[in-house]
């Protein structure tokens, strides 16, 4: 990655005062609480309800504008409904610069005519969508996703790999568990360690309070290093087409992303430099009949299958590196 970004997480803060609530939304609120198993103290419930109502209004207004053709994607209420955008960014995202070892540089194949669309989920390269929970471990999920794809390419077998192994054991390489990390640091740990355990043998706990429990006999993957991709969408496209799923970092801190549901995500406020979330590009394509318009990246997130488009997001492609999708792309070598 160049420049490097450190994906991290901060503490959750809760404000106290709450404005007047809309009684017409009582049934919707109680249904949302039941769906997401929320239980609050008396003082907190009013505040959370007020935050939820504000988010619902933002979502409803956006979708009204979507129906008028002003946006290319829909939003929907989800598990983040009772979080302010500031809390959402603090819990799920955040970054700081960090020096780290550089990988090999990706050399774009010159004589390869890449296809107009690619979807590695249809080729067996991608495990089901996972959920990082209230832990800033997006970097680990992005890293395992890329390695799962490369191991499938090499062996023909798709094995879910252990994010918890990375969370617990890669601090020496510069990662900080639930407080953040880098995909390249994860790839370096796997090389240094000589392997990574399977998800089945080392299940995810969404916490970083345990000591490293790597078991060599349960190792299901290894890598020999990693490759950094030049900061261009054309280079990323060639890598996705010829290599497989690619780890990337994006600016995911906007309310529009917090409540993304479907369509091609584009937010004019999205930064190509202020990256705060690690995800996995598993393909690209276009909507309609014109392959030069409505282009998108297929991105696997780690917020569970209920978020977004069954856990995925279509992100605008060839729109000046929108949200920084090509700024910090890399993959492991096996």
Swiss-Prot record:
InterPro entries per UniProt: Papain-like_cys_pep_sf, Pept_asp_AS, Pept_cys_AS, Pept_his_AS, Peptidase_C1A, Peptidase_C1A_C, Peptidase_C1A_papain-like, Prot_inhib_I29
Enzyme's top EC category: hydrolase
Locations listed in the record: Lysosome; Apical cell membrane; Cytoplasmic vesicle, Secretory vesicle, Chromaffin granule; Secreted, Extracellular space
The EC number(s) this enzyme carries: 3.4.22.15
Tissue expression pattern: Expressed by neuroendocrine chromaffin cells.
PTMs per UniProt: During export along the endocytic pathway, pro-CTSL undergoes several proteolytic cleavages to generate the CTSL single-chain and two-chain mature forms, composed of a heavy chain linked to a light chain by disulfide bonds. Autocleavage; produces the single-chain CTSL after cleavage of the propeptide. The cleavage can be intermolecular.
SUPFAM superfamilies: Cysteine proteinases
Substrates-to-products reaction catalysed: Specificity close to that of papain. As compared to cathepsin B, cathepsin L exhibits higher activity toward protein substrates, but has little activity on Z-Arg-Arg-NHMec, and no peptidyl-dipeptidase activity
Residues reported in the UniProt entry to bind Zn(2+) 7: 276
Residue ranges the record assigns to the propeptide: 18-117, 290-291
Active site: 138, 277, 301
Recorded topology in the membrane: Peripheral membrane protein
Disulphides: 135-178, 169-212, 270-323
GO CC aspect terms: apical plasma membrane; chromaffin granule; extracellular space; lysosome
Notes on activation and inhibition: Inhibited by the propeptide produced by autocleavage. Long isoform of CD74/Ii chain stabilizes the conformation of mature CTSL by binding to its active site and serving as a chaperone to help maintain a pool of mature enzyme in endocytic compartments and extracellular space of APCs. IFNG enhances the conversion into the CTSL mature and active form. Inhibited by CST6. Inhibited by the glycopeptide antibiotic teicoplanin. Inhibited by amantadine.
Domain of life: Eukaryota
GO biological process: antigen processing and presentation of peptide antigen; CD4-positive, alpha-beta T cell lineage commitment; collagen catabolic process; elastin catabolic process; enkephalin processing; protein autoprocessing; proteolysis involved in protein catabolic process; zymogen activation
Glycan attachment sites: 222
UniProt site (Cleavage): 106-108, 112-114
Binding site for Zn(2+) 5: 251, 254
Residues making up the signal peptide according to the UniProt record: 1-17
Residue sites binding Zn(2+) 6 per the record: 274
Name this protein carries in UniProt: Procathepsin L
The organism of origin for this protein: Bos taurus
Native organism taxonomy: Eukaryota, Metazoa, Chordata, Craniata, Vertebrata
């Amino acid at each position: 990655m160049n420049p490097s970004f450190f994906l991290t997480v901060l503490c959750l803060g809760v404000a106290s005062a709450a404005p007047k609530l809309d009684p017409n939304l009582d049934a919707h609120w109680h249904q949302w609480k039941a769906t997401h198993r929320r239980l609050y103290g008396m003082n907190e419930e009013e505040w959370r309800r007020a935050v939820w109502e504000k988010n619902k209004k933002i979502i409803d207004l956006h979708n009204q504008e979507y129906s008028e053709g002003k946006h290319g994607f829909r939003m929907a209420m989800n598990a983040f409904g009772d979080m302010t955008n500031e809390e959402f960014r603090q819990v799920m995202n955040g970054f700081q610069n960090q020096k780290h070892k550089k990988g090999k540089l990706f050399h774009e194949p010159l004589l390869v005519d890449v296809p107009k669309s690619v979807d590695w989920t249809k080729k067996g390269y991608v495990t089901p969508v996972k959920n990082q929970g209230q832990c800033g471990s997006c970097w680990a999920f992005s890293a395992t996703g890329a390695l799962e794809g490369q191991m499938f390419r090499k062996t023909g077998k798709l094995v879910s790999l252990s994010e918890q192994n990375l969370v617990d054991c890669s601090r020496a390489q510069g990662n900080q568990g639930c407080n953040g990390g880098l995909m390249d640091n994860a790839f370096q740990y796997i090389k240094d360690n000589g392997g990574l355990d399977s998800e089945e043998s080392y299940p995810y706990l969404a916490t970083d309070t345990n000591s490293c429990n790597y078991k060599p006999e349960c190792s299901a993957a290894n890598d020999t290093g990693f490759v950094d991709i030049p900061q261009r969408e054309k280079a990323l496209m060639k890598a996705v087409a010829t290599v497989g799923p690619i780890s990337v970092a994006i600016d995911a801190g906007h309310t529009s992303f917090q409540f993304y549901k479907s369509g091609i995500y584009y937010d004019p406020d999205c930064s190509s430099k202020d990256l705060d979330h690690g995800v996995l590009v598993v393909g690209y394509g276009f909507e309609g009949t014109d392959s030069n318009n409505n282009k998108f990246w297929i991105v696997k997130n780690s917020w569970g299958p209920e978020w977004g488009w069954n856990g995925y997001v279509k992100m605008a492609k060839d729109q000046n590196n929108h949200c920084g999708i090509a700024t910090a792309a890399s993959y492991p070598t096996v």
